[in-house]
Design a protein with these regions (language model features):
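Extracytoplasmic loops and strand-loop junctions of Gram-negative outer membrane beta-barrel proteins
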Residues: 28-34, 92-100, 167-168
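C-terminal beta-signal and adjacent terminal beta-strands/loops
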Residues: 59-92, 105-109, 115-169
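Short sequence motifs at beta-strands and strand-loop junctions characteristic
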Residues: 38-43, 100-107, 163
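Amphipathic, alpha-helical segments enriched in basic
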Residues: 21, 25, 29, 89, ...
Length: 169
């Protein structure tokens, strides 16, 4: 009646650019072959899937026959981003470390599905289900400010430039 599947994926998505335009400013500089993590690099992915089924003929209430519960948990390591210092007033930034050398936080999601199959005749039936995505209502961090690594603070007010602006208000 119960099935548990678990898998782990380790991948290294390294390259010279995450999309077709990543290196367009460097086309006149010869063949540069520096590899770095691509924007969509997810080093670690862990999937757990639990499935429980009630079958006909078991000692269960009739309404549970051909019903089931499926729970899926997914955890993924954070994607890379390029960390930089707080932007200067005249524009530009200063990269800290390498391109895509910093990582966003891990994400974690649990999804659930309850279903019931109603059989009409041999080979014909209807599967009714209720699916809940993000069962725990977790707010995963998908993007961060490159100067702070925070999803909510861009770092401007804490910078010297930001403090000067506050004093001159």
């Amino acid at each position: 009646n119960a099935t548990l599947n678990a898998n782990y994926t380790l991948q290294f998505a390294d390259g010279t650019g995450s999309d077709a335009n990543s290196q367009r400013g460097l086309t006149s500089r010869g063949n540069l072959r520096t590899l770095f993590p691509l924007n969509y690099d997810e080093r670690h992915r862990i999937n757990l899937n639990f499935d429980y089924r009630f079958f006909k003929g078991q000692a269960i209430p009739k309404f549970l026959e051909d019903a089931g519960l499926n729970v899926q948990a997914v955890s993924v390591s954070g994607r890379p981003y390029t960390a930089d210092r707080t932007p200067l007033e005249l524009g530009g930034t200063q990269t800290i470390g390498s391109i895509n050398g910093a990582r966003k936080p891990w994400t974690f999601t649990i999804n659930a599905r309850i279903d019931k199959t109603i059989n009409f005749s041999k080979g014909a039936g209807l599967n009714i289900y209720c699916r809940v995505s993000n069962l725990l209502n977790r707010q995963n961090v998908l993007n961060v400010y490159s100067a702070t690594g925070s999803p909510t603070d861009d770092g401007f007010l804490a910078s010297a430039n930001g403090q000067d602006k506050l004093r001159n208000i």
